[in-house]
C-alpha cells in the first residue's frame, strides 16, 4: 500500500504504528439500546444477530476507509509544505491516520473471520487517487495547503464526532479503539485551527478568499454526518453499537433520545462547535477589519439530506432566482478558478506565519526526509 500510493516509510520517523486500546474507557456494560445492562460484547460470536455483526463490519470498514483515503489525498502536500513545522505536522497526521486505518483493519481481521479479512484487504485496494473510496469527500482532490488547513479544521472535526459516537459502542474492541484515536485526532484539529490562525496573522491571503475555502469544506463536513433521518443510525442506537455525541453525559442528564434524527442532532452539535472555533479565529483578525469570518448554514451547498441539491444562500435561506443566477452567486462564496490561479503567486510569499519545531518534534524524524 505504501508503495502504491507513494508514501515513503522513512517519513514516519520514529512514529509507532502499534494497535492501541483503552479498555477502561470502553466500559464493561452496554449503555443504551435494547441490550442495556448486559455485558459488552468482546467477540463477534457474542453479538446476538448477524445484522448487528454486519452493521459493525460496515461501520469499521467505513472508518478505516476514510483513514487510508486521507493519506492518499494528502501525501503529495509534503513536497510543498510552507514551513518545516508544517511538513512535520502533515507527516504526523498522515502517520496517525495510517495507524487508525491499521487499527480498523486489525478489528476486521481479528474479530470477523473471512468476511472481515476480505473487507480489510479492500481497505488497501481502494484508492482516493482513483476516486473509489466509499465516501465522496475522501475522493476529493486536495491540491494545496489552504485546502489542507480547512480540511483538518472542519472535516477532521467530523471525524472527532464519529469517533466519539463509537466510543460507547456495545462491541468492546471497537469502543476501546476510540480513546487512543481521539487523543491523536486532537492534533489534527489543532493543526487546522492553528494553521488558519497563522494564515490570518500573516495577512497575505485575502480574508474573502479564505472565507470561500472555509465555505467549501464546511459544506463537505456537514454532508459527512449523513441523511437527516437515517434508519441505519436509528438501528445502530437500538442495537447499542453507535451512540450520540456525548452519550454518557446525556444519559447522566436523562436527556431523551430521538432515534429518528440522530444524524441531524450530531450535525447540530458539530455546527455549534465550529461556530465557536471560527469566533476564536476572528480574535486574530487585524484591528479595524471590515470582514468577519463566518460559518455557512447547514443548508448551504449540501449534496445529501433535506436540502441536498437545493440552491441556498450561505445563511441558509432558499435562493429564489434561476439556476444561472445561482451559479453567479456561487462564484462569490465558493473558490473559483481565479482563486486557484491567484494562490499560485500567493504561495510564493510567506503566506502563513512561521512556527518553530520543538526539540522533541525535531528529534522524532517525522517528515524530516520528505
Set out the residue ranges of the language-model regions.
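Glycine- and acidic-residue-rich phosphate-binding/metal-coordinating active-site segment common to enzymes
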Residues: 169-220
Amino acid at each position: 500500500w505504501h508503495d502504491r500510493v507513494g508514501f515513503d516509510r522513512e517519513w514516519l520517523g520514529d512514529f509507532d504504528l502499534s494497535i492501541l486500546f483503552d479498555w477502561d474507557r470502553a466500559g464493561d456494560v452496554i449503555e443504551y439500546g435494547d441490550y442495556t445492562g448486559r455485558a459488552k460484547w468482546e467477540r463477534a460470536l457474542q453479538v446476538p444477530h448477524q445484522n448487528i455483526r454486519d452493521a459493525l463490519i460496515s461501520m469499521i470498514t467505513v472508518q478505516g476507509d476514510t483513514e487510508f483515503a486521507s493519506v492518499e489525498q494528502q501525501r503529495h502536500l509534503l513536497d510543498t509544505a510552507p514551513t518545516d513545522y508544517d511538513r512535520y505536522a502533515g507527516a504526523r497526521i498522515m502517520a496517525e491516520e495510517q495507524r487508525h486505518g491499521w487499527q480498523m483493519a486489525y478489528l476486521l481481521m481479528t474479530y470477523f473471520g473471512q468476511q472481515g479479512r476480505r473487507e480489510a484487504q479492500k481497505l488497501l485496494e481502494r484508492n482516493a487517487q482513483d476516486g473509489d473510496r466509499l465516501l465522496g469527500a475522501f475522493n476529493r482532490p486536495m491540491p494545496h495547503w489552504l485546502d489542507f488547513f480547512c480540511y483538518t479544521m472542519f472535516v477532521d472535526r467530523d471525524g472527532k464526532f464519529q469517533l466519539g459516537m463509537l466510543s460507547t459502542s456495545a462491541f468492546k474492541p471497537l469502543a476501546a479503539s476510540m480513546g487512543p484515536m481521539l487523543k491523536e485526532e486532537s492534533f489534527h484539529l489543532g493543526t487546522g485551527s492553528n494553521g488558519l490562525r497563522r494564515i490570518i496573522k500573516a495577512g497575505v491571503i485575502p480574508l474573502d478568499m479564505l472565507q470561500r475555502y472555509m465555505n467549501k469544506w464546511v459544506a463537505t463536513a456537514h454532508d459527512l454526518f449523513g441523511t437527516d433521518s437515517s434508519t441505519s443510525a436509528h438501528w445502530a442506537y437500538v442495537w447499542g453499537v453507535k451512540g450520540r455525541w456525548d452519550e454518557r453525559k446525556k444519559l447522566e442528564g436523562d436527556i431523551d433520545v430521538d432515534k429518528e434524527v440522530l444524524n441531524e442532532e450530531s450535525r447540530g452539535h458539530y455546527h455549534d462547535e465550529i461556530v465557536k472555533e471560527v469566533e476564536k479565529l476572528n480574535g486574530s483578525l487585524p484591528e479595524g477589519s471590515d470582514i468577519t469570518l463566518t460559518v455557512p448554514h447547514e443548508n448551504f451547498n449540501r449534496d445529501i439530506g433535506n436540502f441536498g441539491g437545493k440552491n441556498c444562500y450561505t445563511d441558509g435561506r432558499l435562493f429564489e432566482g434561476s439556476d444561472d443566477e445561482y451559479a453567479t452567486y456561487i462564484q462569490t462564496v465558493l473558490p473559483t478558478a481565479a482563486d486557484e490561479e491567484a494562490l499560485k503567486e500567493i504561495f510564493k510569499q510567506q503566506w502563513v506565519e512561521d512556527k518553530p519545531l520543538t526539540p522533541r518534534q525535531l528529534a522524532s524524524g517525522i517528515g524530516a526526509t520528505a
